[in-house]
């Protein structure tokens, strides 16, 4: 004891990766500001995929009191090719919870009492709402959104509409009012 210990300066760049033992580096020793998504390895950050947004290429008729699957046959985007435009079905094949939205613009006139919009998983209703039609409106939008749990890689989701006017009514094809979309929730 009684001896002084001196320190020497290490030149900038004097310590390379070969001198650092991986076990000595912890995330607590790395400043938060030094960690950016650009510096992380590809695939390390979670994403909201698979995801899709589909619309209709033309109007579609809804028969009276008949649940009808909507023909969303045009993809605006489909990150993982999980939406099928031939059967109008989203099969994510990745287990998880999905935020799903379905909207339709119905050209109805004054004769509709109620309209239902439904989201079905594997052929059964999982989300459904019945909305009264506002008499006198020539067109009205109907929408449903919610979280659907896909617990199996074969689970699929479809969008259905129904109306009770006593006659056939058209769903109007518009990108902003008649659409079907979904994305996986991160961490769910």
Where are the model-predicted features located?
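Short beta-strand/loop motifs in extracellular/secreted proteins, especially
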Residues: 113-117, 155
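Extracellular beta-strand-rich recognition modules
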Residues: 96-106, 141-145, 155-162
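Short, low-complexity N-terminal tether/leader segments at secretion or assembly junctions of large
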Residues: 1-36, 42, 177, 183-186
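A short pocket-lining beta-strand/turn micro-motif at the edge of beta-sheets
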Residues: 152-157, 178
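Glycine-rich strand-loop-strand elements at beta-sheet edges
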Residues: 118-152
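Terminal (often C-terminal
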Residues: 42-112, 124, 129-131, 167-188
């Amino acid at each position: 004891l009684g001896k002084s210990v001196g320190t020497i300066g290490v030149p900038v760049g004097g310590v390379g990766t070969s001198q650092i033992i991986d076990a000595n580096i912890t995330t607590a020793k790395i400043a938060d500001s030094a960690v950016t998504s650009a510096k992380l390895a590809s695939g390390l950050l979670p994403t909201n995929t698979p995801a899709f947004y589909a619309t209709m290429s033309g109007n579609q008729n809804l028969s009276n009191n008949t649940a009808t699957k909507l023909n969303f046959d045009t993809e605006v985007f489909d990150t993982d090719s999980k939406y099928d435009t031939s059967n109008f079905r989203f099969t994510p094949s990745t287990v998880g919870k999905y935020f799903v939205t379905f909207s339709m613009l119905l050209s109805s006139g004054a004769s509709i009492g109620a309209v239902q919009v439904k989201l079905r998983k594997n052929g059964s209703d999982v989300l459904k709402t019945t909305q009264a039609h506002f008499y006198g409106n020539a067109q009205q939008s109907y929408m449903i959104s919610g979280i659907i749990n896909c617990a199996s890689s074969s689970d699929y989701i479809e969008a259905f509409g129904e109306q009770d006017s006593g006659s056939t009514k058209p769903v109007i094809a518009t990108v902003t009012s008649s659409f079907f979309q979904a994305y996986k929730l991160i961490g769910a």
